[in-house]
């Protein structure tokens, strides 16, 4: 029988968080293509926990697998502290948000690795302009069949999670009108967005093998869905979120994804069903989430009615309530209600801009919020 207690040696639902940070010059407020210099020292300290991304102005970090959300918080704080400290040694800093408010993709340098050269060769301008930053959460799975079963039903909640995480309202100096413009940009890539449902793990693997055999992809990691079974880690990977600005937001979202996975697995173990909805209808909600975030309405497909997004966040927290105490994540998940009431990072960015009419002030505030509660790194 599957254990839902993180202290149990049989607990499968471990947690891992990957964050993509912006490398920023605090004087000009612009992105800086400087990751190679940061990596030189970062690899010595963090080893496999730090890696470059397509653009030289981005750095990706990942926690070790964690059993509890408290372990994950400690890891995220440590990683933000180290990367900010390494950046500071070069007169730079970091931001965690889905897009940079003012910098242009045309000014960015591409990381000179063969992998990224291949991406640019295939995707051309789509790759060059993909100057976006996300947060990925891995939840451990007992096996492939469970991963597919849970992916099928968890897809329904992806727009809700996105609405809470929105942090990309600005793009190249313009107010886009979106709460998550990152999502709109990423939709230009193939194999993105809400995944289809699969009847079994075998059907999923057959699909992946077909793509590889027909030269669509050379690696299953080039399936970029908002939720996917990770091809190597044995996890279900939630990829829908904009990069979370505050540590508290990052941890609340990760705690929700772990709790949601456990809740859905518990329902399966009790022979309680959760309807598998068509991709097309979930995409309607994703559009609303990326456009209006928490200020909009999402469709409750069970009720066949629109519901205020903020009200649905209360329902979502109530839905996972019964597993929170065993997971030890009640405080972290209930922080989502503060986000629902007070707004996401996108809402705060827009508020700063309304008050100041100055995108530099938005950048300055993002720098402050990214490092709230993060101690200065001591080399």
UniProtKB/Swiss-Prot annotation:
Q: Does the keyword ATP-binding apply?
A: yes
Q: What's in the keyword line of the UniProt record? A: ATP-binding, Ligase, Nucleotide-binding
Provide the reaction this enzyme catalyses.
L-cysteine + L-glutamate + ATP = gamma-L-glutamyl-L-cysteine + ADP + phosphate + H(+)
State the EC number(s).
6.3.2.2
GO terms classed as biological process: modified amino acid biosynthetic process
Which Pfam families does the record associate with it?
GCS2
A GO molecular-function term, please?
ATP binding
Ligase as a keyword of this entry, yes or no, is: yes
Q: What's this protein's family per the entry?
A: Belongs to the glutamate--cysteine ligase type 2 family. YbdK subfamily.
Q: What does this protein do?
A: ATP-dependent carboxylate-amine ligase which exhibits weak glutamate--cysteine ligase activity.
NCBIfam families assigned = gshA_cyan_rel, PRK13515.1
Name used for this protein in its record: Putative glutamate--cysteine ligase 2
What is the scientific name of the source organism? Roseiflexus sp. (strain RS-1)
Print the organism lineage. Bacteria, Bacillati, Chloroflexota, Chloroflexia, Chloroflexales
């Amino acid at each position: 029988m599957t254990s839902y207690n993180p202290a149990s040696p049989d607990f499968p639902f471990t947690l891992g968080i990957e964050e993509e940070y912006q490398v920023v010059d605090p004087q000009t407020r612009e992105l800086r293509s400087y990751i190679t210099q940061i990596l030189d020292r970062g690899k010595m300290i963090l080893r496999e926990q730090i890696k470059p991304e397509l653009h030289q102005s981005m750095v990706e970090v990942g926690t070790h697998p964690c059993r509890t959300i408290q372990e994950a918080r400690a890891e995220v704080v440590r990683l933000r502290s180290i990367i900010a400290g390494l950046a500071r040694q070069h007169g730079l800093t970091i931001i965690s948000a889905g897009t940079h408010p003012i910098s242009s993709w045309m000014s960015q340098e591409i990381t000179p690795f063969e992998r990224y050269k291949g991406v640019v060769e295939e995707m051309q301008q789509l790759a060059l302009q993909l100057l976006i930053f996300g947060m990925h959460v891995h939840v451990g799975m007992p096996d492939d069949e469970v991963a597919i079963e849970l992916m099928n039903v968890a897809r329904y909640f992806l727009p809700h999670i996105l609405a809470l995480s929105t942090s990309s309202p600005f793009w190249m100096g313009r107010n886009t009108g979106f709460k998550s413009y990152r999502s709109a940009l990423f939709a230009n890539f193939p194999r993105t967005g809400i995944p289809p449902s699969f009847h079994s793990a075998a059907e999923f693997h057959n699909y992946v093998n077909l793509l590889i055999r027909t030269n669509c992809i050379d690696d299953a990691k080039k399936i970029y869905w908002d939720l996917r079974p990770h091809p190597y880690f044995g996890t279900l990977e939630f990829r829908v979120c904009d990069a979370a600005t505050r540590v508290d937001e990052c941890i609340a979202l990760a705690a929700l994804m772990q709790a949601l996975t456990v809740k859905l697995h518990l329902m399966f173990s009790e022979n309680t069903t959760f309807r598998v909805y068509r991709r097309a209808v979930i995409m309607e909600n994703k559009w609303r989430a990326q456009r209006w975030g928490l200020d909009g309405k999402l469709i409750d497909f069970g009720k066949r009615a629109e519901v205020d997004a903020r009200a649905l966040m209360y329902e979502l927290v109530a839905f996972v309530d019964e597993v929170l105490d065993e997971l030890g994540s009640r405080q972290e998940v209930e922080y989502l209600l503060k986000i629902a009431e007070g707004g996401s990072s996108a809402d705060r960015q827009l508020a700063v801009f309304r008050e100041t009419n100055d995108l530099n002030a938005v950048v300055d505030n993002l720098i402050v919020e990214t490092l709230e509660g993060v101690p200065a790194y001591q080399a």
